[in-house]
Amino acid sequence: MAASCGHKSILEDNVDRRVEDLLSQMTLQEKIGQLNQVSLLDGFSEEVASQIADGKVGSILNEADPAIINYYQKAAVEKTRLGIPLLVCRDVIHGFNTMFPIPLGLAATFDPELVQQGARMAAEEATARGIRLTFSPMLDIARDPRWGRIAEGSGEDTYLNEVMGVAMVRGYQGDLDDTTCMASCVKHFVAYGAAEGGRDYNSTGVTERVLRNFYLPPFEACVKAGAMSLMTSFNDNDGIPSSANGFLLKDVLRDEWGFDGFVVTDWNATREMINHGYAVDNKHAGELSMNAGVDMDMVSCAYIDHLEELLAEGKVSMKQIDNAVRNVLRVKFRLGLFEHPYADVEKARTASYAPAVLEAARVSAVESTVLLDNDGILPLDKAKVKTVLVTGPMADSPYEQMGTWSMDGEGSRTVTPLKALKDLYGDDVRIIYEPGIESCLDKAGKGVGKALAAARKADVVLAFMGELAIMSGEAHSLAEITLKGDQRAFLEALYKTGTPVVLTVMAGRPLELGFELDHSDAILYSFHPGTMGGPALAQLIFGDETPSGKTPVSFPKSRGQIPVYYNHNMTGRPYRGETLLDEYQASGRQTSLGGTSVWLDSGLDPQFPFGHGLTYTTFEYSAPKLDQVEYGMDDTIIAEVMITNTGNRKATEVMQLYVRDLVGSVTRPVKELKGFKRITLEPGETKTVKFGLPVQNLAFYGQDMVKKVEPGDFHLWIAGNSASGVPVAFSVY
C-alpha cells in the first residue's frame, strides 16, 4: 500500500513495533554505532569497511559508486550481529546526474509542480546508485547575495521557501512502497542565511520573534509534509551554536511540531563547537549535542569516541541514546532498507539521462530564466537576423553551466548555448563563435580583438557571461558581487561596436547589474541553468519559448544596499521619494528635519524587485475585487482580478498576491507574499483569476509570542511583482 513518506499511516504501527524490537536487542556499542556517520571523500576504504563490520557506523556519505556502496552495505547487513543496513547519503541538491537549474533558479520558476517533478527524477537517478537520503532542500531565508549559499535556496521570501521546500520534500520522498523513495534532510536549522556580512559560517543574531515569523516556517511546513531528517546549521545564533540549541531542537522541533525523524549535524559541526569557544574538547562537544537533541554526528567522531564514557559519567542518559537510535532506525524502516538494502548495479548503468528527465531539465531551465530588461531586441527574428556572434566565457562552458553542487553531473552531457544555437538554428542563421575571454576570471587577451572584429560584422551579439560554478555555494562568499575578470570591460567594448548586444548571465547569486544595463540591449538571467540550459536559452532568445521567470530575491543596485529585500518592516520615517545626493546644491544647509529612511546616493528601491520578470508581451491587471470587506477568523478571503495579455504573443505570467497588516502589536512588513499562480494567456485574451486566502494565513507571532491573527485593517495586492499593483482594503474582526 502506498503512503506519503514520513506521514503517519497504517504502516507506522508496524514500523514502531520493529524499531522497539530491534532496539531491545542492541548493545550500547551497537546503538552508538547507529549514531555515527562517516565520509568516503577519499574513495574506497577498507578501514571504513572494517568499522562497518564492527557495528561502528550507521551511515555513510560521499560515495556514489553502486558497487562500492554494495560492498559497504554487505559488511553492514551480513557481517554485523543484527544486520542493520547503512543509510547512504549524498548532496543531491538540484539533480543527480542530470542537473536541473540551481535551487535559486528553480525558485524563479514559481512552479512547485515542476520543482516536485524534478526532485522525483533526481531521486530516481540517485536511488539507482544506492543513495537513500539527500541533504536537501535548503530552507535558509537569504537576503544577502554576498553569501555563497544563496544559490542553494529559494531566496528571500518565507512563503516561497515554504512552497518550494515542500515540493522538493514530496518529490524526493515519493511513496513508502517504492525503492526510489529518497529521504529528505531539510537544512540548515536555523538562520544560517542571516550570516553577518554574508560571510559563510558567520554568527547570526536573529531574535526568537523574527525566527518564528520568517526563518522557521519553511522548516515547519516541510516537517508537516513528512521530511524524514533535519540538519543543524554551522552558525551560532545569539551565542548558541545550532548543534547545541536545545530550545530549537527539542522545544520547537520535537515538542511543538512533533518531528519524529532524526537530526544530523552539518559536516564536523559538533567538533567545531571547540572553535566557537563553546566546548572545551570533542567529548564536551558530544555531550552538548546529545543533550540538545542531535541524533547523528556527521564525521566529528564525538559520539563514537565519547558517548559510552559520557554515559558512565552520567552526563548523558541511556534514554537520550535510545531516543536518538529510535529516530535513526525509524527512518531506515520507513525507507524499506531492511527489505531492499542493495543498489541495482545493472539498473544504475541506465538510470540517468532519460529523455523525459532531460526534457524536464530543459523546461525547468526555460521557466527559471528571468528576462530582466529588453529594449525590444528580443526575441530575435530568424527572418531578419542572418549573422550572430556568440561570445563570452559562459557560451561553451559545460561544467560551469551546471552550477554549485554538481558533483555527479557530467560536463560531457551538458548542452551549452553554443552547441544548442548551432544545432537548433545553425541552418537558418550564421553562427560565429569567438569567446573573447576564456574564463569568467580572465583578463582580456588577444581573443578580445577577434571577438570585436566579429561583432562589427554581425547583426546581433549574444554575450554569455557570469560566474564560475565554484564562485557560489558553501564557503564561497564574495565581498563584491559584480562580473569578475575583464567581463565588464569586454561587454563595454562589444556594446561600443554599435551592434545590438543581448547579455545572458549565468550566476549563483544576484549580481550588481547597473553597468550591464547601460551596456546591453537586453539581459536574460538564467542563474546556473544545468544540463539543458543551452537549448532553453537558445529557444528563449529566438522566441520558440517565452520567458516567465520571476526574481526570487531582490537585485541590489550596489553592495551598499545589502541587505535589501521587499518584505522589510515600515519605519517611523518611510521613504517618500525625496531628493537624492546628486541633486543637492553644493551650498545646501545642513539639516535632518524631514529626512526619511533612504540611501541618499541610491534611493530605496533595488535594481530589480522581488517577483520581477518581463516577457515578450505585456499584461494589464485590473484592481482586485474581494467577495466582502470584513472577515471572521475562520473565513477565507476570495480575491479576483482580471488580467489581459495586451501584446501579440502567447505568454505566461506569474500573478502574485501580497498582503499588509496595517497595525499590529509589533511592527509588520510593508508587504508579504501570500499566494501566486502561473497563468498562460493568448494574445488579447482576458481571464478572471481567483485567489483563496484563509484568514488564518495572516497569523504571526506578536508581542505575546503567540501565533494568531490580530483583528484590524489590511491591504491586498495582486500584481506582477512586489513593487507594483493597486491595493484593496479589508478588515478582520
Q: Where do the model's predicted regions map?
A:
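Edge beta-strands of extracellular beta-sandwich domains
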Residues: 726-730
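Glycoside hydrolase catalytic-domain context in secreted enzymes
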Residues: 2-700, 708-722, 733
